[in-house]
Amino acid sequence: MSVRENIINFKSQLPESVKLVAVSKTKPNNLVMEAYDAGQRIFGENKVQDLAAKQPELPVDIKWHFIGHLQRNKVKFIAEFVDTIHAVDSLKLLKEINKQAVNNNRTINCLLQFHIAEEESKFGLNMQEAEELLKSDDFKALQNINISGVMGMATYTDNTEQVKKEFSNLKTYFNKLKSTYFSQQTAFVEISMGMSGDYKLAIEEGSTMIRIGSSIFGARI
């Protein structure tokens, strides 16, 4: 199927509560525009250099999500336009995002990344680290970031029960943070989990945002 057909197919099967992030990393602008023309507005990139190059050449109403591991010294290159940064796993990174948001007179949405998988290669916080971050005076002083939810990546495995358990754990973390730290904040709503291979399981476990690349655009170039 074409990119357009894939977008329409995904949109038809997703619950209204679930947002689709079309992961356009490594893909040329003409394929991004094919998805855009099919109604897609949220796109995800995982390399600062690629995102900074694409953004000026594509429609201004695209909501760009940065979904990769973000180095602090590169935040400034996307701070002017990025809508949401998915993989935030340290106070130092949050402080830099806030600094660059102030410089650009805007607020940037951030998702706290939790380590829910077995692989050590995955980044992310555990619950204790997240709570220490949120309790800190340094965090409370940040005025130009909006913590809009959590994200995580499950173990790459065929064991569906394990994947479901990991997604369920992330939903539990979200609920605990919501009730303890964000009960008065209506913007804390997102659970970003699920990719091309496991998004159906993620939706069953409460995902509000799935990140889909190969099932829309085909295999990586």
Explain the meaning of each model-derived region:
Residues 1-197, 203-205:
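Conserved alpha/beta-domain cores
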